[in-house]
Amino acid sequence: MSDRKQALDMALRHIEKQFGKGSIMKLGEQAEQRVSTVSSGTLALDIALGVGGYPKGRVIEVYGPESSGKTTVALHAIAEVQRNGGQAAFIDAEHALDPVYASKLGVNIDELLLSQPDTGEQALEIAEALVRSGALDIIVIDSVAALVPKAEIEGEMGDSHVGLQARLMSQALRKLSGAINKSKTIAIFINQIREKVGVMFGNPETTPGGRALKFYSSVRLEVRRAEALKQGNEIVGNRTKIKVVKNKVAPPFRLAEVDIMYGEGISREGSMLDIASELDIVEKSGAWYSYKGDRLGQGRENSKQFLKENPEITAEIERLIRDHHGLDGEAKLEEAAEEQAFEDVPLDLK
């Protein structure tokens, strides 16, 4: 063995002794090299994300205009995690979460941890404590724009607090990012949009909270309403576009189009019908939709209703779509393996 190799082995042993097992290793020695994911709860978005869902242990930013469906997207992710036996938390900085609507989306509100903090510092400290516990699978912060620094709350209405929120987010993400990765928690930050003053060329839109969140996010989703969905003269929902504007785990700039129905959330059947039609799993002839020669219905809304009333056909079509895109179905939460990995590398290293 060469002197260089001996020196390296000695250094590695010293590092492991000082900082714990797993603090340094060769990249190929990692047990899980493939990105571990949890379904977003929406088939179209799972496909757009490229890996079948949200990557575990990563920061996700969901932003867009008001009432575009940002919180709905996050609540569907919570419902999916809970359905697979995971633990979820919701930091409601906007104090606007509707428990009735959340339960209609499939969220188990009896098991959902909810915090409605007074200040931005309190919200992020609660988030850090929950993540460092290692017992959480997903945490949603709604929203970054509502994380008001303590100094601003205690100050007068006209006081200027330049860059205070940006510094708060930058410090919080420096502390949170390592813990999020080690505990395999999915951290979803919901954000609003603002317009930069005096921009003549290019997009004037930006997100509040500084640049830190843009850098730390592995996935950034832009949610926008495209058009209203009508039944007769009544508006029953919105056609919504979700664009993956940043993606560190798969190619970015993919687009998912979904139907967000009022009081119901994202229409699973609508997404499935659109994707299945594109792949010719479901045949479309004029206004009629057919599957294996059997007619589903005339028009998109009637076909959606047929799929809703026949879950076995819906499940069969979903399986064919997932097989075509190479998605492994629903990612189960590997609790035992994660707990072991979590014990090997303690989180409260200061």
UniProtKB/Swiss-Prot annotation:
InterPro entries recorded: AAA+_ATPase, DNA_recomb/repair_RecA, DNA_recomb/repair_RecA_CS, P-loop_NTPase, RecA-like_C, RecA-like_N, RecA_ATP-bd, RecA_C_sf
GO cellular component, one term: cytosol
Record's keyword terms, sorted: ATP-binding, Cytoplasm, DNA damage, DNA recombination, DNA repair, DNA-binding, Nucleotide-binding, SOS response
Pfam families: RecA, RecA_C
Residue positions binding ATP: 64-71
Taxonomy, superkingdom: Bacteria
Molecular function GO labels: ATP binding; ATP hydrolysis activity; ATP-dependent DNA damage sensor activity; damaged DNA binding; single-stranded DNA binding
Chief location bin: cytoplasm
GO aspect biological process, one term: SOS response
Localization annotation: Cytoplasm
Function: Can catalyze the hydrolysis of ATP in the presence of single-stranded DNA, the ATP-dependent uptake of single-stranded DNA by duplex DNA, and the ATP-dependent hybridization of homologous single-stranded DNAs. It interacts with LexA causing its activation and leading to its autocatalytic cleavage.
Protein family according to the UniProt entry: Belongs to the RecA family.
Name the record gives this protein: Protein RecA
Lineage: Bacteria, Bacillati, Bacillota, Bacilli, Bacillales
Name of the gene this protein is made from: recA
